[in-house]
Amino acid sequence: ELAKKAGAKGIRFYGICCSGLSAMYRYAGVIPLSNAVSAELVLGTGALDLWIADVQDVFPSIMEVAKCFQTTVITTSESARLPGAERFEYDHHHSNIGETRELAERIVKRAIESFENRKGVPVYIPPYEVDAEVGFSVEYVHKRFGSMAPLAEAVKSGKILGIVNMVGCNNP
């Protein structure tokens, strides 16, 4: 409701990086866009109103790209502190887990404020999409297909053109 009052169609959540992204995609509808190595490219579309970094890898250059597109950057952990980012403290060891809902509400409100402040910022979203199956492991392939054989056959026959291994924590 708050987002619609601000003129937005709604709120969408996207994921960039590693920790838990496949589970967030599969069970919570968080759409994966990239890993940390190409995160600046995603931010460079101008389409993101708020960028939040928790304990995952994030490069300091993200702040320079965010400035170009007036994107708000929030960090929630000691390991992802960035000069110029807003700080919303959350302990990944769960000492303040009781504050999770309140923190999430603050972040959503801040995203809506950022949306309002960014009106007029140029946005370029490439005109294509790619269907992908993400977050699979050997165990997942066995559960989904019964064995590795159907996957191997689909690759050999050309039904699947390739497999991309986009893993987290591949940063230098």
Per-region residue spans from a language model:
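Metallocofactor- and cofactor-centric catalytic cores in central/energy metabolism, strongly enriched
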Residues: 1-172
